[in-house]
C-alpha cells in the first residue's frame, strides 16, 4: 500500500499535466532558479569540474529545508542523521564521517568557518543560497573538508527591501515565529535585522518520569550592514546569535529477541543548552582585473550537556560537559577577474581557537555496587584483603583546555582552451600547518573499609592525572582537474584531489583512564598509563579520483550531473566505546575505500511543473582494520576487512516534484505544491556489520496558497509515518537506538510587505 501511495504522489505532476495540455505556460521560470556567485573563492559552480548542488530560496522553502539536518538525502550521498541533540550533528558524505572526531565536512556561513560540529545545528531563516561541494576541497578550504563543504549565504538588504513575518503551528506542540526587516537607505548602504523563535514539545516520552524526552526551544537573531563605499570597494558586517535549550538523547533499549526498540527509560537528566555568537567583517576590493577579499570572523559559543550515560533507570554514571569556545579566523584571498584564458587565485589563512571543557563524570550508587565493588571482590577471592566501598557517589572532575593554531597558503590556477578550444586544466596546491596543545587535570578519591581479621580499617585511595600534551600536523594538499567542454551546454571532467581531517585529543577517554589508575593505586606491578598514547589520534587522509559530466539542454530546462568517484582513505577516524563502557575512544581504522556514483537531474517540465532526481551510491568498506574486542573476560582480535563502514548509508535517493499554477481574476493569485520522496539505506550500525537499518523511505509535502502579500502553507513530514532508526550505540552490553521522528503536520502563515 505504501509503494502504491508513493507512486501516486510522484506521478501527480505528470497526471495533471496530461489533463491540462492546453493550459498556457504562464511561468517562464518556476523551477530552475537563477544561481548567483557569493563565494570569493569560487566562480560559477555549474562551470567547475566538481560535484556540486546549489539550492535557491524557492527550493529551500518548498522542500522544507529548515536546518542543516534537512539537507540529508536531499543532496546525493549526503547523510546527516537527526539524533541526540543539537550538539550531535554528524555529516556523512560519500561514506565518510565520524561521530566524535573533527568533522569530515566543513561548514561556512557567509564565508565564516564553523570550527565545531557542536555549532552546526541551527535554524535556517532568510537564506538566499546553499552550496554543497562533494569530494575533498582541501586546496581552497583546507582542514576538515575531506568529504566536502557546505556554504550557506543569508539574504542581503540589496536583494530585498521590506518586512517578512511568518508564524507556524503544528502537532507535537510546534510553535514557530520568524520576523525580519530589510532596508536600503540609499544606493550604497543597506541594513537588516531578523529573528526567530521555535519550540516543539517533543516526540518521545521518558517512561521513567513520563515527561517528553526531546522537547526543544531555540531562538536567535541576525543584524547585517552592507556598505558600497566606492564602486570598487564594499564592506559587510554581520552579527548573529543562536540559542538552544532542549531535553536530549531519547535513546531506547533494543531487544534483539523481538527486534523492537523501547521508549526511553532513564532516571538522570539528559539535556543540552547552547548560546552562540558570530561576528564577521568582509572587505572586498574589485577592479576589472582582480578581486581582493579579507574575511575576519570571531565565533563564541558556550554549551552545557548533561547525559545519563547508562540510559537506564539505574544510577550507574552520568556526565555533565560544559564547553566554552573562542575562535578567530582571518583569510585574505586574491583572484583574477579578467576574461583571459588564464585564471588564478592566491590565499593566506590563519586561525586561533581556544576551547575550555569542564567534563565531570559521576559514578553513582549502582555503578559503584555493580562495577567498582566487584573489582575488589575478585581481588579478595584471590587472597587480597576484603575491601568495601563506602562512597555512594564517586566524582571524577575533569578540566581540559585546548588551544589550536593553524595557518595555510594556497594557490589555484586554471588555463582555459589549452591546445584546443574547450579543454582546460586546473591545478592547485595548499600548504597547511596546525598545532594543538592540551592542558588536562582530573582526579578522584575513593573511600573504603578494609577488613583484616576482626579489624575494620577505614582508608582512602586517591589519584591525579595532570599534565600537558601537544600535537602538530603539516600537510600538502594538491588538486588537478582536466575539463573538456563541447560547448556552453555540456562538459566532462576528471579530478584528482587530496583531503585531510586533522587529528587531536579525545578527552572522553579520561574517565576510563582515571578509573584504571585508581584501581591500580598501590599496585607496583601495574602497567603505567601512557596518557599521550591513550588520548591522541592521528589525521585522516584521502585521495579522491572523480570523473563527471554536466549538461544543460532545452534552454536550461533540463540539467544533468553525473559522476563516478573512488576515495582511498587512510587512518580513518572511528569512535568506539572502551571495554569498560564508561568512555569513548577514537581509533585510526587502517584503510578504507569508498567508491560510488551520483546522479542529479533537474527538469522544468513546463505547465508549471518541475522534477528533481538526486541519487547517490557509496560503497565504503574496510580494506585493512583489526581491533581488540572484549568477549567475556578475554580480549580477541577481530578482522573487519571487507565490512562496510558503519553509520553511512549505501544509497540515498530524493525525488522532488514541484508545481505552480497562476490564476487570473481569482480569489488567490497562485498555488504551489511540493512533494519529496526520500529513500535511505542500507546502514550498518557497527564494524562487525551485525546490525543494520534496511532501506527505508519517507514522504514530505507542502501546499501553498498565495494572495497578494499573504501565503498560507499546509505541510507535512514523514507522511507515511515510517518507522526507522537514526542512531545506534552500545553501553554496558546493552544496545540502544534512537527512532526517527513520526508524522508531523502543520500550517504556516507568511506575510511579506
Question: How would you describe each model-predicted region?
Answer:
Residues 68-71, 90-95, 108, 132, ...:
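N-terminal periplasmic accessory domains that precede
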Amino acid at each position: 500500500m505504501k509503494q502504491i501511495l508513493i507512486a501516486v504522489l510522484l506521478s501527480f505532476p505528470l497526471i495533471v499535466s496530461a489533463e491540462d495540455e492546453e493550459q498556457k505556460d504562464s511561468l517562464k521560470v518556476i523551477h530552475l532558479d537563477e544561481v548567483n556567485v557569493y563565494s570569493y573563492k569560487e566562480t560559477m559552480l555549474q562551470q567547475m569540474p566538481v560535484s556540486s548542488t546549489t539550492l535557491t530560496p524557492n527550493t529551500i522553502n518548498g522542500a522544507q529545508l529548515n536546518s542543516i539536518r534537512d539537507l540529508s538525502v536531499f543532496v546525493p550521498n549526503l547523510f546527516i542523521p537527526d539524533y541526540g541533540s543539537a550538539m550531535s550533528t554528524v555529516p556523512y558524505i560519500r561514506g565518510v564521517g565520524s561521530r566524535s572526531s573533527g568533522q569530515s565536512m566543513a561548514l561556512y556561513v557567509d564565508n565564516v568557518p564553523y570550527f565545531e560540529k557542536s555549532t552546526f545545528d541551527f535554524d535556517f531563516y532568510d537564506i538566499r543560497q546553499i552550496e554543497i561541494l562533494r569530494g575533498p576541497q582541501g586546496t581552497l578550504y583546507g582542514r576538515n573538508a575531506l568529504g566536502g563543504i557546505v556554504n550557506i549565504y543569508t539574504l542581503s538588504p540589496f536583494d530585498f527591501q521590506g518586512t517578512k513575518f511568518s508564524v507556524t503551528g503544528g502537532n507535537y506542540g510546534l510553535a514557530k515565529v520568524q520576523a525580519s526587516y530589510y532596508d536600503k537607505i540609499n544606493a550604497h548602504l543597506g541594513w537588516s535585522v531578523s529573528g526567530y523563535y521555535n519550540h516543539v514539545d517533543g516526540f518521545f516520552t521518558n517512561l521513567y518520569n513520563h515527561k517528553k524526552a526531546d522537547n526543544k526551544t531555540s531562538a536567535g537573531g541576525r543584524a547585517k550592514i552592507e556598505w558600497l563605499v566606492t564602486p570598487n570597494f564594499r564592506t559587510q558586517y554581520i552579527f548573529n546569535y543562536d540559542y538552544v535549550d532542549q531535553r536530549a538523547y531519547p535513546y531506547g533499549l533494543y531487544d534483539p529477541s523481538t527486534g523492537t526498540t523501547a521508549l526511553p527509560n532513564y532516571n538522570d537528566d539528559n539535556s543540552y543548552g547552547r548560546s552562540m555568537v558570530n561576528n564577521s567583517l568582509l572587505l572586498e576590493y574589485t577592479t576589472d582585473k582582480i578581486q581582493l577579499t579579507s574575511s575576519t570572523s570571531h565565533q563564541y559559543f558556550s554549551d552545557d550537556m548533561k547525559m545519563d550515560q547508562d540510559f537506564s533507570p539505574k544510577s550507574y554514571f552520568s556526565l555533565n560537559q560544559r564547553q566554552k569556545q573562542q575562535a578567530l579566523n582571518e583569510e585574505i584571498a586574491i583572484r583574477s577577474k579578467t576574461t583571459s584564458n588564464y585564471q588564478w587565485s592566491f590565499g593566506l589563512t590563519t586561525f586561533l581557537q581556544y576551547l575550555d571543557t569542564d567534563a565531570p563524570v559521576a559514578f553513582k550508587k549502582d555503578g559503584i555496587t555493580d562495577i567498582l565493588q566487584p573489582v575488589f571482590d575478585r581481588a579478595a577471592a584471590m587472597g587480597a584483603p576484603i575491601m568495601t566501598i563506602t562512597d555512594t557517589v564517586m566524582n571524577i572532575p575533569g578540566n581540559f583546555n585546548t588551544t589550536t593554531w593553524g595557518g595555510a597558503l594556497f594557490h589555484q590556477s586554471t588555463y582555459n582552451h589549452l591546445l584546443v578550444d574547450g579543454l582546460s586544466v586546473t591545478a592547485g596546491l595548499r600548504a597547511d600547518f596546525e598545532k594543538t596543545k592540551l592542558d588536562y587535570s582530573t582526579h578522584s578519591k575513593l573511600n573504603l573499609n578494609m577488613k583484616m581479621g576482626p579489624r575494620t580499617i577505614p582508608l582512602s585511595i586517591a589519584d591525579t592525572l595532570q599534565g600537558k600534551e601537544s600535537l602538530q600536523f603539516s600537510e600538502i594538499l594538491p588538486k588537478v582537474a582536466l575539463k573538456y567542454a563541447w560547448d556552453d551546454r555540456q562538459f566532462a571532467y576528471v579530478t584528482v584531489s587530496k583531503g585531510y581531517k586533522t587529528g587531536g585529543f579525545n578527552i572522553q577517554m579520561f574517565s576510563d583512564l582515571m578509573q584504571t589508575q585508581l584501581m591500580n593505586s598501590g599496585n607496583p606491578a601495574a602497567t603505567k598509563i601512557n596518557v599521550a598514547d591513550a588520548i591522541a589520534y592521528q589525521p585522516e587522509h584521502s585521495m579522491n579520483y572523480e570523473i563527471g559530466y554536466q549538461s544543460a539542454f532545452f534552454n536550461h530546462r533540463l540539467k544533468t550531473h553525473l559522476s563516478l568517484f573512488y576515495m582511498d582513505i587512510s587512518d580513518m577516524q572511528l569512535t568506539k566505546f572502551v571495554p569498560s563502557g564508561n568512555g569513548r575512544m577514537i581509533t585510526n581504522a587502517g584503510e578504507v575505500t569508498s567508491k560510488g556514483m551520483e546522479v542529479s537531474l533537474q527538469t522544468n517540465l513546463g505547465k508549471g511543473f518541475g522534477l528533481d532526481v538526486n541519487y547517490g551510491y557509496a560503497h565504503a568498506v574496510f580494506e585493512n582494520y583489526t581491533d581488540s574486542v572484549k568477549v567475556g573476560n578475554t580480549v580477541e582480535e577481530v578482522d573487519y576487512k571487507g565490512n562496510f563502514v558503519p553509520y553511512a548509508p549505501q544509497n540515498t535517493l530524493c525525488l522532488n516534484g514541484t508545481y505552480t499554477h497562476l490564476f487570473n481574476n481569482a480569489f488567490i493569485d497562485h498555488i504551489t505544491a511540493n512533494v519529496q520522496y526520500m529513500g535511505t539505506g542500507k546502514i550498518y550500525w557497527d564494524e562487525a556489520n551485525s546490525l543494520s537499518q534496511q532501506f527505508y523511505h519517507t514522504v514530505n509535502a507542502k501546499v501553498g496558497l498565495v494572495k497578494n502579500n499573504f501565503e498560507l502553507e499546509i505541510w507535512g513530514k514523514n507522511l507515511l509515518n515510517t518507522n526507522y532508526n537514526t542512531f545506534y550505540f552500545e553501553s554496558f552490553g546493552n544496545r540502544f537506538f534512537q527512532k526517527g521522528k513520526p508524522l508531523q503536520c502543520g500550517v504556516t502563515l507568511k506575510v511579506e510587505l
